[in-house]
Amino acid sequence: MGLRIEVKNPDVLVPGPLVVLSRHASLADSLVSAWAMGNIAGLHPRYVLKRELMLDPCLDIVGHRLPNYFLNRTSNNVQEELAGVAALSKDLGHSDVSVIFPEGTRANASKRQRLLEKLTERNPERAQLLAPLTMLLPPKPAGAIALMQGAPQCDVVIAGHVGFDGLDTFGGMLRHLEQGNVKCVMWFRRIARPDIPTESMAAWLDQQWLLLDTEVQAQSEALKGVK
């Protein structure tokens, strides 16, 4: 695909264990995050993935060889699914990291508008708070909170990236192939666990996502014109 990848600050990933909350924009960014955390930082990532990915034979086989959790997003037993997410973090060793994509799906403009409209109907105050989002989707807090609560001793890392936008469909990937040389940038922001409120994690996550959105905007502007 002619992809050039810059990981700005992998040093903040060490030491582990960690819980990582990552932006999700494409079919490729989860693979790149695994490469950054595994090959560069020397950590062992385990992912919360949607169960639909089990239809991919490679992900089904490899995904089950690793301690990942395939989330059933249509389950009637939400508490059971959240318990499975929390369990992914409960036995993290010093070089382990658990990863979730709080947006729950690959972000694009149409999804963002649709989700904000639905949020306006259910929770107007939160919708107004998250209305400034221009790059990310409103985060779904339940899974992220479960993952963090499963490892209450772990610092949390917010993972951002740019350059993968437009790769959320196979058509988008083909267009990037035609462009040839594409640069992607990934960065991490580590937050000490004592700085994370235990009683208002959902509100904290919204604030972190608003901050990440501004970071993504700034990095996207910086990336323009870079060849």
Language model feature labels by segment:
Residues S75, Q79, L137-P138:
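Conserved phosphate-coordination/catalytic loops
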Residues V7, Y69-R73, R190-A192:
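Short acidic-hydrophobic, aromatic-tinged amphipathic segments that line or gate anion-handling sites
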Residues L3, L43-P45, C154:
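A structural micro-motif
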Residues L18-N77:
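Catalytic core of membrane glycerolipid acyltransferases/transacylases, capturing the structured
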Residues M1-V19, H24, V32:
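Membrane-anchoring hydrophobic helices of lipid-metabolizing enzymes
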Residues D195-K227:
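Accessory terminal regions of nucleic-acid processing enzymes
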Residues R51-L66, G93-E199:
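A cross-family acyltransferase "interaction/gating" segment
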Residues V78-K90:
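A Trp-anchored, charged/polar loop motif used as the substrate-binding/catalytic surface
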